[in-house]
A protein has these predicted regions:
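The −1 position to Zn-ligating cysteines in a subset of zinc-ribbon hairpins
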Residues: 56, 60, 281, 343
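Radical SAM enzyme [4Fe-4S]-AdoMet core and its adjacent flexible, acidic
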Residues: 2-11, 52, 73-74, 79, ...
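Conserved alpha-helical substructure of the radical SAM core
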Residues: 7-152, 170, 174, 178, ...
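Residues that line or immediately flank small-molecule/substrate-binding pockets and catalytic motifs
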Residues: 68, 102, 157, 227, ...
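Flexible mid-to-C-terminal extensions adjoining Fe-S/redox cofactors in radical SAM and related proteins
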Residues: 29-47, 67, 279, 296-356
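Alpha-helix N-cap/helix-start and coil->helix boundary motif
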Residues: 58, 105, 113, 136-137, ...
């Protein structure tokens, strides 16, 4: 566990639910470990969820599933405040964390502060994270309202300068840079961490070491690297993954490791590209449950398209009923057998060979 996650865990332990809710929380934890021990396909109430408040966005990024077949076919909209609160009411005694993010730009949801405040009234120890592209007009004004209320603001930065603008269509790197520097100052000495996230592609991978230096230069402490997931990118063949095996990619990874060692003020929280991949590496059948803006629970955040696959709608029944629906349990049974569902075709958890 890295320092950032340890800090969050300690904050959570200090602020566990009180009274009868503490016993509900503990009983649910015991149930979780019991079901895991007996290899059940059922799950306890979730300790973490992703709540997609909106799937609308101001950008058209080349790496985003919204820009391909599944994304173009999806219904677009935003979750009502009442629906979001209903989900929180049902789950809060069991939650350790909640991500207010999804296929859209979080700060297009005008009631974001109201939702954050509502979660905190339930239990101030619930860890809240949001993701953003940080280039909306008046972004600083919007984000300032939840600084010191949320625990992590993750910001997408898929390269620098022209490479960034090539990938993140309709975005300006100059505007992003200005907002990042301002936000770093605003969040200084608060309980809100800023973390930059880069999706590693053929077009930008050489920027990885430079991005660590840039993160240090603008006064941000955390950086994350993730690989491009082709599960929802319909017009790119899985052979795209081959470049991750190239000698030059390996060279840049070594350069990245060297830069990280020389930049102790920046903690790179995720860059583990070298593990073996198969369906059982995927955690999403069991955790980080994804609730779409229209109430459907999709299998994961990499392919959150209810028209392709969903296990039920939480607006029609309780969340726990959907999580333990027969179709969801059947999906989990494949995980135990390490049989990849057709839905997961091209996912990097499965089809990307371990990077040597």
């Amino acid at each position: 566990m890295n320092k950032r996650r340890l800090k969050k865990a300690l904050r959570r332990l200090i602020n566990l639910p009180g009274g009868i809710y503490f016993f509900l929380y503990i009983i649910n934890k015991i149930r979780h470990f019991y079901l895991k021990a007996i290899k059940s396909t059922r799950v306890a109430y979730p300790s973490t969820i992703m709540l997609e408040l909106t799937n609308q966005c101001n950008l058209a990024c080349t790496i985003c599933p919204r820009e391909y077949d599944y994304g173009k076919a999806m219904d677009k909209g935003k979750m009502s405040v009442e629906s979001a609160k209903k989900i929180i009411d049902e789950l809060w005694p069991y939650l350790d964390s909640i991500g207010l993010t999804g296929m859209g730009e979080t700060f297009l949801y005008n009631e974001i502060e109201e939702i954050v405040d509502y979660i905190k009234t339930k239990n101030k120890g619930i860890i809240i994270s949001v993701s953003t592209n940080a280039v909306l007009p008046n972004f600083i004004e919007k984000v300032s309202k939840i600084v010191d209320k949320v625990d992590t603001i993750q910001i997408s930065i898929d390269g620098l300068d022209d490479v960034y603008e090539h990938i993140r269509k309709n975005a300006s790197f100059q505007e992003l840079d200005r907002n990042l520097r301002l936000l770093a100052k605003i969040t200084s000495n608060t309980n809100t961490d800023i973390m930059l996230n880069m999706v590693v592609t053929k077009e930008n991978y050489s920027h990885m070491p430079t991005l660590v230096k840039y993160t240090e230069e603008i006064g941000i402490k955390y950086m994350d690297f993730t690989l491009l997931n082709l599960a929802s990118v319909t017009n790119i063949d899985r052979s795209y993954y081959d470049f991750y095996q190239s000698s030059h990619f390996s060279y840049v990874l070594s350069e990245l490791d060297d830069t990280i060692n020389k930049t102790p003020s920046v903690l790179v929280t995720e860059r583990n590209f070298r593990t073996d991949n198969n369906f059982q590496k995927c955690p999403y059948p069991w955790t980080h449950f994804y609730i779409c803006w229209n109430g459907y629970i999709a299998p994961c955040c990499a392919k959150p398209f209810p028209k392709e696959l969903n296990f039920g709608n939480v607006f029609n029944t309780k969340v726990i009923n959907v999580l333990n629906d027969t179709s969801y349990k059947r999906f989990r049974s494949l995980w135990y057998k390490n049989i990849t569902p057709d839905f997961c075709d091209k996912c990097h958890f499965v089809d990307l060979e371990s990077i040597k």
